[in-house]
Regions:
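Juxtamembrane/interfacial segments around transmembrane helices
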Residues: 8, 85-88, 128, 156-164, ...
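Hydrophobic/aromatic end-of-helix segments at the C-terminal termini of transmembrane alpha-helices
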Residues: 51-54, 115, 187-196, 230, ...
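Transmembrane helical elements of multi-pass membrane transporters/channels
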Residues: 74, 108, 137-141, 149, ...
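Small-residue-rich hydrophobic transmembrane alpha-helices
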Residues: 1-45, 82-101, 193, 206-272, ...
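Short runs within selected transmembrane alpha-helices of multi-pass transporters and secretion channels
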Residues: 3-10, 74-93, 101-112, 130-145, ...
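Short alpha-helical transmembrane segments in multi-pass integral membrane proteins
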Residues: 13-80, 122-176, 234-299, 341-384
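A short secondary-structure junction motif
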Residues: 113, 146, 150, 190, ...
Length: 384
């Protein structure tokens, strides 16, 4: 639910900034802030009050119940912070203050590390100390990004305003499909992991996937960063009706992403035997992870294309198409493909990775064709 608002809010704010209407962007932030605050407080109360019941539903081991309940009451009871931080961070980023948003995250993480050490090894507070450190670090992160936004951005003083109902409708129009796509992805990944658990009795295939994902995340982070930066610039340019510049910028971001992702993934595949030794000395496991890293070259090629074009389409207002592509290909290729190649054909984790790579590449083709069609140009949220 938090993602519904924050992703839609970025599209609305960035387009209005590009259209020279920072006051409307401020309105969008206020609406997003109020909505997420209400939902965050509601979720905090639910997690704090019903933490024990929630843990019983997921059948947590009896030995872990008490510490898990303590942690969930403290961290879950403060989950409204998770609802507010993305709003203020997005507000900074869409106005171009990306480094300042990063400062809040870095300082918060450093404080978390320091307080974890103090609470665990000096005060011996155990799980309660870890939970307290997490909450305090998030409070600091929130104060930093909220304070910087108030000092650096003066959109509140801008006179432009439109009906709040219209802004909320635009936010939901973009945010709901984005959240639905994320939900579909999570369900698909759950099914894939379930199939992979059926491939062997000792969990080698699932563990190999976990190792490969940890290594490939370095490549993914580059693609995600480029997609996020390009999405903001896409919103600015669409708001200003600079469609040709928007098209060139997105193509350039995809090119940079493909070059970077390919270099990373090829390097990881070539040096896989050395890297995987960090996690395990099991020769069979190392060989399996290296095979996954080789397939991951093609997976990352498709994924970075999806990320950049998909985010650009959503920010432009064309948010339905990526959901349709995800609903079709994530299940047709990734889920069904994992079962067919991994279990039926006996390729196991390698088959699952081939299926996931096929999903990413198929969706990438669809995203490219959709972008080239130019239909996103008519989806603008701003009327000049």
């Amino acid at each position: 639910m938090f993602g519904v608002i924050s992703s839609g809010m970025v599209a609305v704010m960035s387009q209005n900034i590009g259209a020279g209407r920072p006051g409307v962007a401020y309105q969008a932030r206020q609406l997003g802030l109020m909505f997420n605050a209400v939902m965050g407080i509601l979720m905090s109360v639910i997690l704090a009050v019903f933490s024990g019941g929630i843990l019983r539903i997921v059948s947590i081991a009896p030995a872990l119940f008490e510490p898990a309940e303590t942690y969930l009451k403290i961290v879950g009871g403060a989950c409204f912070l998770n609802a507010l931080i993305p709003i203020y961070s997005s507000y900074l980023r869409v106005f171009g203050y990306t480094k300042h948003s990063l400062i809040g995250t870095v300082v918060g993480n450093l404080i978390n590390i320091i307080l974890n050490s103090v609470f665990l090894f000096v005060f011996n507070w155990g799980v309660m100390g870890v939970a307290a450190a997490t909450v305090i670090s998030r409070v600091v992160n929130l104060l930093i990004v909220a304070g910087m936004g108030a000092v650096l951005i003066k959109a509140k003083q801008s006179p432009e305003r439109i009906p709040s109902r219209k802004i909320l409708a635009q936010i939901v129009k973009i945010g709901f499909p984005s959240a639905l796509e994320t939900a579909l992805y999570n369900v698909a990944m759950t099914l894939i992991v379930r199939f992979m658990n059926q491939m062997d009795a000792d969990g080698m295939n699932v563990t190999a996937r976990s190792y490969a994902m940890q290594i490939a995340n370095f490549s993914y982070c580059v693609g995600a960063a480029l997609a996020q930066a390009n999405a903001i610039m896409t919103g600015w340019r669409i708001g200003a009706k600079e469609f040709e510049e928007c098209d060139r910028g997105t193509r350039k971001a995809v090119l940079y992403g493909l070059i970077t992702a390919t270099c990373f993934s090829v390097a990881f595949a070539l040096s896989g035997h050395f890297i995987v030794h960090i996690f395990t000395d099991d020769t069979q496991m190392i060989n399996l992870v290296v095979k996954l890293l080789i397939v991951d070259i093609f997976l990352e090629f498709g994924r970075v294309t999806n990320l950049v074009y998909g985010q650009a389409l959503k920010t432009s207002g064309d948010a339905i198409f990526p959901v349709i592509m995800g609903a079709i290909f994530m299940y047709l290729f990734a889920v069904v493909g994992t079962y067919f190649l991994g279990i039926h054909m006996g390729l196991q984790a390698v088959g699952a990775y081939i299926a996931m790579a096929g999903d990413e590449c198929a969706r990438a083709v669809g995203m490219v064709l959709r972008w080239k069609s130019g239909k996103w140009k008519s989806k603008s949220l701003v009327e000049l």
